Amino acid sequence: MFVDQVKVYVKGGDGGNGMVAFRREKYVPKGGPAGGDGGNGADVVFEVDEGLRTLMDFRYKRHFKADRGEHGMSKNQHGRNAEEMIVKVPPGTVVTDAETEQVLADLTEHGQRAVIAKGGRGGRGNSRFATPANPAPQLSENGEPGKERDVILELKVLADVGLVGFPSVGKSTLLSIVSSAKPKIADYHFTTLVPNLGVVETDDNRSFVMADLPGLIEGAHEGVGLGHQFLRHIERTRVIVHVIDMSALEGRDPYEDYVTINEELEQYNMRLTERPQIIVANKMDMPDAADNLAAFKEKLTDDYKVFPISAITREGLRELLFEIANQLETTPEFPLYNEEELSDNRVMYRFDEGDAPFEITRDPDGTFVITGKALERLFKMTDFSRDESVKRFSRQLRGMGVDDALRERGAQDGDIIRLLEFEFEFID
């Protein structure tokens, strides 16, 4: 089964907790704090494996949770960092954040990697908090939570040339003749439901990858006839070969077919109309095909070359393949997204924008509810079993302006404040 889109959940590993410990040795009174830091949580890294062809594996495993870092230990021993979690994806995979729709990575080359969910930093042990005023601190940090998100994986096939056209115009037959590909061929519409790739070699030893893309119909750019799934595979192609049935046995006018498909490409955007297009007048061995071709050329206003062929008799194929190879030599690649160039094995990570400021709302029962990524991160990294940690958390809230904001909202002594699952009283 060919799977080209799937939604998965990824979570970086949490950082290990820091430790509260003190040096206890004979003849060393008041040895001081000796709690080690926690290790960093593991990143979730997507890596391209050229041996994969579809996203089929993700249909059976959709949750990827990396390991957390090791906790800190006594004697200032730091916890071990967790090893990154490698998730293999096929070439041509585009990773998009499901919530923000931001493209996180476009993975095209073997070995290319992208950090999709960053692991959390390890919490600091109590030796990190020692000061002249507090030489024996009784506080440490919990590990930072790892980044978690839902992402959408889309596979957009890597091909130099894309065959487009209405269903049953002979695209699969053409690919099977000029390459060793074996697409399904039958006398009904939408026989091809997944892209088929084939390597084509010309008589002068030039080669390229050709993709037989499922047939398009009017409204494809809006998703009609699975149009979105089909059109995404054209995005990476450098040359579009537009196959038209000149026999008109389906009862459609060849020129109207041509106009309709080009309108769909234009509406879909992704700069598809900027690519060179070669028109292939197929089924020239059929009756009335020559007359239909003459009428087609009279109506054609675009400056595209038209190649009359018969995929069955192989008439005109040599000239067509030479023209495709010539166009590829002069046509650059069309990048899908404006991204920095990445070396094959470089790990890329797009940092999020700064944490949003906190927000304060009030429930019907009068409870003030505080939300915000920065505050929630501090909360999760606080060890509420230790008084010093709680006092530090209160100071952090005050320093961020939470107390003043609560007063402005009308908070008074004794009012209940909620942050995640933690409730406390407001003291003015």
Curated annotation (Swiss-Prot):
Domain OBG-type G: 159-329
E.C. number(s) listed in UniProt: 3.6.5.-
Gene (name only): obg
Broadest EC class assigned to this enzyme: hydrolase
Coiled-coil portions: none
Short name of one Pfam family: DUF1967
Cofactor(s) this protein cannot do without: Mg(2+)
Kinase in keyword set: no
Organism: Bacillus pumilus (strain SAFR-032)
GO biological process, one term: ribosome biogenesis
GO CC, any one term: cytoplasm
The protein's name: GTPase Obg
Domain OCT: 350-428
Domain of life, per lineage: Bacteria
PANTHER family in the record: DEVELOPMENTALLY REGULATED GTP-BINDING PROTEIN-RELATED, MITOCHONDRIAL RIBOSOME-ASSOCIATED GTPASE 2
InterPro entries: G_OBG, GTP-bd, GTP-bd_Obg/CgtA, GTP-bd_prot_GTP1/OBG_C_sf, GTP1-OBG_CS, GTP1_OBG_dom, GTP1_OBG_dom_sf, OBG_GTPase
